[in-house]
Amino acid sequence: MTTDTHTLHIEEILDLLPHRFPFLLVDRVLDFEEGKFLRAVKNVSFNEPFFQGHFPGKPIFPGVLILEAMAQATGILAFKSRGKLEPGELYYFAGIDEARFKRPVVPGDQMIMEVEFVKERRGLTRFTGVAKVDGEIVCTATMMCARSKPATAVVTKSEVTKPDVKES
């Protein structure tokens, strides 16, 4: 249930993103403006499955998952701005530049992701992203995401097993 037009709760996030446990990394959207920016939360819990091995005795939220959380935030912004995915359409991470990690994120942290549209061209959208904990920057990156229907070819069994016929 939405309390205002700029906040999204988990039910609405689940309606927009295909990700599910343990890979859904956005817990709530705090604010957004279509076509401009989005601010979201990831509550980092010791119960996350990757903390068993990253690292035993010194749990650290993996940097690649900070980037994934920001990428999921771009997906929510894109879907709220341009509409949901159509059947067969995909939204995927297409590139990353200038990723910088400033400090570790640990269990108990509440990570705020802020993403902004930079530009869109030929099916690719460029975003900037910043992740913060307690107002302190933990990660910055420029990300590219793509939205498209993958090319598919349908070949029947008879076409595959048909003997080559040479014309004379």
UniProtKB/Swiss-Prot annotation:
SUPFAM superfamilies: Thioesterase/thiol ester dehydrase-isomerase
Family as reported in the entry's similarity comment: Belongs to the thioester dehydratase family. FabZ subfamily.
Protein name listed in UniProt: 3-hydroxyacyl-[acyl-carrier-protein] dehydratase FabZ
Reaction catalysis annotation: a (3R)-hydroxyacyl-[ACP] = a (2E)-enoyl-[ACP] + H2O
GO BP of this protein: fatty acid biosynthetic process; lipid A biosynthetic process
Catalytic activity, EC: 4.2.1.59
Stored InterPro entries: FabA_FabZ, FabZ, HotDog_dom_sf
Source organism: Yersinia enterocolitica serotype O:8 / biotype 1B (strain NCTC 13174 / 8081)
Name of the gene: fabZ
Gene Ontology annotations for the cellular component aspect, listed alphabetically: cytoplasm; membrane
GO molecular function terms listed in the Swiss-Prot or TrEMBL record: (3R)-hydroxyacyl-[acyl-carrier-protein] dehydratase activity
Role summary: Involved in unsaturated fatty acids biosynthesis. Catalyzes the dehydration of short chain beta-hydroxyacyl-ACPs and long chain saturated and unsaturated beta-hydroxyacyl-ACPs.
HAMAP family in the record: FabZ
Superkingdom of source: Bacteria
Keywords carried by this UniProt record: Cytoplasm, Lipid A biosynthesis, Lipid biosynthesis, Lipid metabolism, Lyase
Main localization category: cytoplasm
Subcellular location: Cytoplasm
